[in-house]
Amino acid sequence: MAEFILNAADFGVPRDGKTDSTERINQCLSTAVSKGYHTVWFPKGTYLIDATLGGDLNQRFRNAGIIVPGNLEIMMDPECIMKVIPNSSWGYSAFYVGKQENITISGGQIIGERDEHTYASAGIRSTHEWGFGICIEGCSNVVIDDVKISDFTGDGIIVSPRGLKTNQDYRTSEQIIIRRCEVRRSRRNNISITGCDMVTVEECLIEDAGTGNGTAPKFGIDIEGYGEGDVDYEEPINVSIRNNHFVGNVSSSVTNFNGYGILIEGNHSDNTISYGYGTQTVIKGNILRRPEDAAAAPRVGITGLGVSQGKETSDAVIAGNLITGFSTGIDVRGKSVLVTNNKISNFENTGILVYQSSDVKVDGNQIQNGLSETRRSIGLRAVLSDDIAFLNNCLIQVVDGVNVSGGNMIIKDNLLRKFSRGIWIAQGNAVIEGNTLNPDAFEAVPESYSVSVTNNAGAIIKNNTFKEFKNYPIYCSTSAKTSIIGNHLERSPLLVTIYISAGVHEIFDNTISVNRTAGNPIVIYLNGSAGSIISGNTINNLSAGTATAIQTNTSTNSKIIGNRIFKGTINKHSSDTIDGNMIV
């Protein structure tokens, strides 16, 4: 096998850290391919690279620096250093791989010159964000393995197509693998993926993108094709980002700005992971932990931006992630999103926020320890959204459990424990069914209502269980209709247990027990309503004194029918209909 490996030292490539090695390296690689070598070995040493050499006049990073031919493996000793010579160009490439196939680059260190760079004025290119460590354009079957890349004025690695998708000469990059690399301190992004099919980034350390004099967007990994309106000129599809460690990247760890079919799995991250305007993104099994000493600016663990122009849905799945220490755990935006089996803790603002979204299912998540000295934390929140389902979630130790402002909602089979205010519907229409609500002597702030419906919101409050409350378990002040059906309220200690004001309401088949230590409690109090129905309820007064089981004297035309009342009375209005009630 040795005869198929060309040692760059034998070819006379300088590695003294004083002599420009670029032209000699290019000659070495070209000779290796022409003579049938499959591998070129670079031994220990410092190789100075003119990353501007040969660059295209319009795209200075193209055909610049070390030009890697196809069907070749470049192997570098761990102490082989490829060091870019300081320059003033707005764009360059240490290694350029263009329209080639079957290439491996492994080992060694590729070091840029961001700290020595001269940031000369360059018009629209004045950001100098196109200085790359490895630039891959329109290639197939490329592997970057165990390479340390740092300190570039643009990106450590960029994977792009050659040409535009609207032209016949468009050539995407496909079957690209970046693994076991360390990519650090790029001014723009550590890795950019702009146009591709089948790219994998795995088991890498991706650190400190955009720090210092960084330039936007400052992402660990940016998956972002160029497009205008609903036309894609570059298309990143089928990308897997898995089992990487992200540390200290300024704006986000991974952002799928507009890619298709993106998997982000099993990563460790201290900053945001975003599905952006992407389509068919799966974010699963990641550990997101915000350090306690991190910057105080609000941060979101997992987020999105919305539906891409020209597309109908986001089709995103956010599943099985562990998120702790962020201001907001998950911020959902777009259409057709599933958020399931995530665990979110130690947040200040919101566990899961659904904002300007539709067709979103939030199912089976555990949200806990939402405590803040400056704001009321919220476990689940929906704002300006429609067709949203909050199902089977467990919310523990939050100030406000569920807060809804607008749209149609289903809130079903959730467990809320240790909260101040449980479920609050401020706008829209909600079905609140099968939930268990237990404030359980919450002490962080004074206890408020377990379920409340206000303003002009409407709700069906059905088959819920209320335990250990010290304030209204059900409070409605809405002008719209509510139906309160089949709920179970245990041992109320309150002077008034259910308070309903204004609107027209149905209060059917609820089971309520009351045990107040002083005074005469009122169990159902209907105030300022006209034409409501109270029927089939079982009210069991365990208090020493007699209770007013149903009070409607400040409402009109109420129908009080078929209720079972133990140790209580009815205080009605003269216009009410009373029939078939059993009072014991």
Curated annotation (Swiss-Prot):
Residue stretches spanning the membrane: none
PbH1-type repeats, residues: 100-128, 139-161, 173-195, 196-225, 236-266, 313-333, 334-356, 357-382, 406-427, 456-478, 529-554
Disulfide linkage: none
Origin superkingdom: Bacteria
Protein's UniProt keywords contain Ribosomal protein: no
InterPro entries noted in UniProt: Beta_helix, Carb-bd_sugar_hydrolysis-dom, PbH1, Pectin_lyas_fold, Pectin_lyase_fold/virulence, RHGA/B-epi-like_pectate_lyase
Alphabetized Pfam families for the sequence: Beta_helix, Pect-lyase_RHGA_epim
Keyword Repeat: yes
Sorted UniProt keywords: Repeat
Annotated protein name in UniProt: Uncharacterized protein YclG
